[in-house]
């Protein structure tokens, strides 16, 4: 193993991730500086989770790992896997989503099928009713998913849509018990507080890419708008889930730049998406990432974030193909199951069988 990797491995393995907080009689965690390791930490205040998060490698070290020759790729994965097994060694975290409002988005994100700027033929529908949202929640709960992401297109929800969704959330929580995650666009502090009160425990809002590459991907809103949304969610006591998409033309250094920003924001969970080029979008002819480059990039994120959840989500089928199980060898500790927003995911039974074979899920 390369000396750089061996030194990083020793240093990261020497750090200790505190055990999950014990529940109180009310079912919430006692205030503490400890960090929670498991995926089902919806009721733990963010400040109680992350104040003693083990330190990952520096940006300079991450760049050095990215520049190692291809012959060291397996050693990079092995290093990340060792870190994952110590700091995030529990069962694989699983989440699923529903496309609760689709299409006609005014944003011009170059990768997105739902943008009104692109001719993709993507489905268009208004906000789903409570019964449909409840049915999907129950399906995901029965499949083993711990978290249910409700995703809507558009810059942000209207006041009426937000109220409708919060009413549905109360019922979903009462009847299924599944943890709720909102992915509803830009968020104000008042909207974040409303979601928290309705029973949402986390909020997902991707930065998509690094600040330096963002202008090549989107021109209709500012990078700081997305950062403000993540901060508003965290300030409201919501668990924050934010990541990006690999393979849009960014460099290794820009993926690492995004990782550093996510660390500064102290997010709880990092979803990694791999570009699946969609016809009609500006990135339709973009080749998919080489599988090993994608896996090495995931591994570098694990080295930078030893104890945060890292979930591989959209695009894993197109980019990784038969190597999908390698995401866990690369340091990921979870994945999205079921279908995505506008594309079909792998059969859930196949994913669950894969997880059982790997021993990361019963």
Swiss-Prot record:
Residues at which [4Fe-4S] cluster binds: 105, 109, 112
Enzyme Commission no: 2.8.1.6
Superkingdom of origin: Bacteria
MF annotations from Gene Ontology: 2 iron, 2 sulfur cluster binding; 4 iron, 4 sulfur cluster binding; biotin synthase activity; iron ion binding
Gene3D superfamilies according to UniProt: Aldolase class I (3.20.20.70)
Disulfide-bond pairs as recorded: none
UniProt keyword list: 2Fe-2S, 4Fe-4S, Biotin biosynthesis, Iron, Iron-sulfur, Metal-binding, S-adenosyl-L-methionine, Transferase
Pathway given in the UniProt record: Cofactor biosynthesis; biotin biosynthesis; biotin from 7,8-diaminononanoate: step 2/2
Catalytic activity: (4R,5S)-dethiobiotin + (sulfur carrier)-SH + 2 reduced [2Fe-2S]-[ferredoxin] + 2 S-adenosyl-L-methionine = (sulfur carrier)-H + biotin + 2 5'-deoxyadenosine + 2 L-methionine + 2 oxidized [2Fe-2S]-[ferredoxin]
Described purpose of this protein according to its UniProt entry: Catalyzes the conversion of dethiobiotin (DTB) to biotin by the insertion of a sulfur atom into dethiobiotin via a radical-based mechanism.
Subunit note: Homodimer.
Protein name in UniProt: Biotin synthase
Lineage: Bacteria, Pseudomonadati, Thermodesulfobacteriota, Desulfovibrionia, Desulfovibrionales
Protein's gene: bioB
């Amino acid at each position: 193993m390369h000396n750089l990797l061996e030194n990083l491995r020793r240093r990261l393995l020497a750090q200790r991730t505190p055990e999950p907080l014990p529940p109180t009689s009310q079912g919430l965690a006692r205030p503490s500086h400890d960090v929670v390791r498991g995926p089902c930490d919806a009721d733990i205040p963010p400040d109680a989770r992350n104040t003693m998060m083990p330190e990952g490698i520096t940006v300079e070290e991450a760049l050095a790992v990215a520049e190692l020759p291809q012959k060291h790729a397996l050693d990079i994965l092995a290093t990340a896997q060792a870190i994952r097994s110590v700091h995030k060694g529990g069962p694989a975290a699983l989440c699923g989503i529903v496309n609760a409002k689709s299409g006609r988005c005014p944003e011009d994100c170059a990768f997105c099928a739902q943008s009104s700027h692109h001719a993709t033929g993507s489905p268009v529908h208004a906000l789903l009713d409570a019964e449909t949202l409840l049915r999907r929640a129950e399906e995901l709960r029965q499949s083993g998913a711990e978290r249910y992401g409700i995703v809507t297109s558009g810059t942000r929800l209207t006041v009426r849509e937000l109220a409708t969704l919060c009413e549905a959330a109360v019922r979903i929580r009462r009847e299924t018990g599944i943890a709720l995650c909102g992915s509803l666009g830009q968020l104000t502090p008042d909207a974040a507080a409303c979601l928290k009160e309705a029973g949402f425990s986390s909020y997902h809002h991707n930065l998509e890419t690094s600040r330096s590459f963002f202008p090549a991907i989107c021109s209709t809103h500012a990078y700081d708008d997305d950062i403000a949304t993540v901060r508003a969610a965290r300030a409201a006591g919501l668990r924050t889930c934010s990541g990006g998409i690999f393979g849009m033309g960014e460099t290794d250094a820009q993926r690492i730049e995004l990782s550093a920003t996510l660390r500064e924001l102290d997010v709880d969970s990092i979803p990694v998406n791999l570009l699946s080029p969609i016809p009609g979008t500006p990135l339709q002819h973009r080749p998919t990432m080489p599988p090993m480059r994608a896996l090495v990039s995931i591994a570098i994120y694990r080295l930078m974030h030893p104890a945060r959840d890292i979930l591989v989500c959209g695009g894993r089928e197109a980019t990784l193909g038969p190597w999908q199980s390698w995401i866990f060898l690369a340091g990921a500790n979870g994945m999205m199951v079921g279908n995505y927003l506008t594309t079909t995911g792998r059969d859930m039974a196949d994913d669950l069988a894969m997880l059982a074979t790997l021993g990361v899920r019963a």
